[in-house]
Amino acid sequence: MATKESGDAKAQLALSSSANQSKEVPENPNYALKCTLVGHTEAVSSVKFSPNGEWLASSSADRLIIIWGAYDGKYERTLYGHNLEISDVAWSSDSSRLVSASDDKTLKLWDMRSGKCLKTLKGHSNYVFCCNFNPPSNLIISGSFDETVKIWEVKTGKCLKTLSAHSDPVSAVHFNCSGSLIVSGSYDGLCRIWDAASGQCLKTLVDDDNPPVSFVKFSPNGKYILTATLDNTLKLWDYSRGRCLKTYTGHKNEKYCIFANFSVTGGKWIVSGSEDNLVYIWNLQTKEIVQKLQGHTDVVISAACHPTENLIASAALENDKTIKLWMSNH
């Protein structure tokens, strides 16, 4: 698969599903540190803002999920129950529930308000590494070191489908905005798009030199896929054509599965953690690095963007163990 930038590199990419596109914001972002959240006792693995914008969930190698206030970083509650470290956490669309993926080979479904574990999803034969809800939040998807992707029914906790997805650990799984498609990425170097209903593989995106795919995510409107590979590269794909549209570089990512994100509340940015302890922000259109956020003292494994405010949460590994909230005026 050609990885050259196809077509007009200056083509404006609309990410939002809304018809009324906001005009490009000309100024670069000016994110500044708002607060540092201390609570985890080992490496933080994932941070996610709730869809309603109220909360931030963090997961950690300390086997805990902590819920914080999204705006002030105030500690809310801790969710206990996993026997081994947690790699990922994700919110339901109504912000009432969370799902977590753990090295104990299970996923757990949590009630946000009570902090109670509602269900434990068992079936993977190795570490569960990544998880997400579909938009109606009646299904959960998970990826594992057992090289499969599983689709679970939230109501019953039963596994509905197992996709023999990859030939190496699955690093990331995500539904598109309609819930009709699933994207998965793997250390086997492949990014695959699946029909969520049938479990059929519709398309495979592959790079020339096949570096491990460490992260994948659909854009908010579902037209594009953002991939991260362990050769210090992020790429934006038009998956319907199987073409790479944009390449983002300058950060360091050769070892860890670092979360990346679309930031659409102000300007249109790509945001990622990095192994040089920084958060990188690129202009989505021009691919230029517009800001680097300095403050963490270890690899920034996860960066999340707030759904409505110009707010970024970042989290770092075991020499740091903290979460930082950053805010921008635009």
From Swiss-Prot:
Keywords from the named record: Repeat, Ubl conjugation pathway, WD repeat
Q: Where is this region: Disordered?
A: 1-26
**What GO MF annotations does this protein's record show?**
histone binding
The UniProt entry, under PROSITE patterns, shows: WD_REPEATS_1, WD_REPEATS_2, WD_REPEATS_REGION
Q: Where is this motif: DDB1-binding motif?
A: 188-192
Q: Name one GO cellular component term.
A: Set1C/COMPASS complex
Q: What is the protein's known function?
A: May function as a substrate receptor for CUL4-DDB1 ubiquitin E3 ligase complex.
Subunit and interaction comment: Probable part of a cullin-RING E3 protein ligase complex containing CUL4B-DDB1 and a substrate-recruiting component (DCAF). Interacts with CUL4B and DDB1.
Write down what this protein is called.
WD repeat-containing protein 5B
Organism per entry:
Pongo abelii
